[in-house]
């Protein structure tokens, strides 16, 4: 799959970036290169290959070090009030934040 100039213009519009004709041409070449690489990766037979949790784990002895969740300090009503005093807005012991999803 190759992108044409109209595809790149549409992507730029959706991303809300303005591209000059020269930049559009370079972006088209770069995006087509990325798509070509993705096509090559999809063509590789990975049947029977164990997934990696970390990209270097195949070459080095890397294990994920997990720890138990533990309370590091006990919250008191005074410490909670002190923390909430730093908040621009709070109600009923909770931080109030602006709505971010419309």
Swiss-Prot record:
PANTHER family: GLUTAMYL-TRNA(GLN) AMIDOTRANSFERASE SUBUNIT C, MITOCHONDRIAL
EC code: 6.3.5.-
HAMAP family: GatC
Name the record gives this protein: Aspartyl/glutamyl-tRNA(Asn/Gln) amidotransferase subunit C
NCBIfam families: gatC
Family per record: Belongs to the GatC family.
Keyword field: ATP-binding, Ligase, Nucleotide-binding, Protein biosynthesis
Organism: Bordetella bronchiseptica (strain ATCC BAA-588 / NCTC 13252 / RB50) (Alcaligenes bronchisepticus)
GO annotation, biological process: glutaminyl-tRNAGln biosynthesis via transamidation; regulation of translational fidelity; translation
Subunit structure: Heterotrimer of A, B and C subunits.
Record field: catalytic activity: L-glutamyl-tRNA(Gln) + L-glutamine + ATP + H2O = L-glutaminyl-tRNA(Gln) + L-glutamate + ADP + phosphate + H(+); L-aspartyl-tRNA(Asn) + L-glutamine + ATP + H2O = L-asparaginyl-tRNA(Asn) + L-glutamate + ADP + phosphate + 2 H(+)
Domain of life: Bacteria
Known role: Allows the formation of correctly charged Asn-tRNA(Asn) or Gln-tRNA(Gln) through the transamidation of misacylated Asp-tRNA(Asn) or Glu-tRNA(Gln) in organisms which lack either or both of asparaginyl-tRNA or glutaminyl-tRNA synthetases. The reaction takes place in the presence of glutamine and ATP through an activated phospho-Asp-tRNA(Asn) or phospho-Glu-tRNA(Gln).
EC category: ligase
Single GO MF descriptor: asparaginyl-tRNA synthase (glutamine-hydrolyzing) activity
């Amino acid at each position: 799959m190759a992108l044409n100039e109209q595809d790149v213009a549409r992507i730029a519009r959706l991303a809300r970036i303005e591209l000059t004709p020269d930049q559009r041409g370079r972006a088209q070449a770069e995006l087509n290169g990325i798509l070509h690489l993705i096509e090559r990766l999809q063509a590789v037979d990975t049947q029977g290959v164990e997934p990696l949790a970390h990209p270097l784990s195949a070459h080095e002895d890397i294990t994920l070090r997990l720890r138990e969740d533990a309370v590091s300090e006990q919250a008191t009503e005074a410490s909670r009030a002190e923390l909430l005093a730093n908040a621009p807005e709070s109600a009923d012991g909770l931080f109030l934040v602006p709505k971010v999803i419309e």
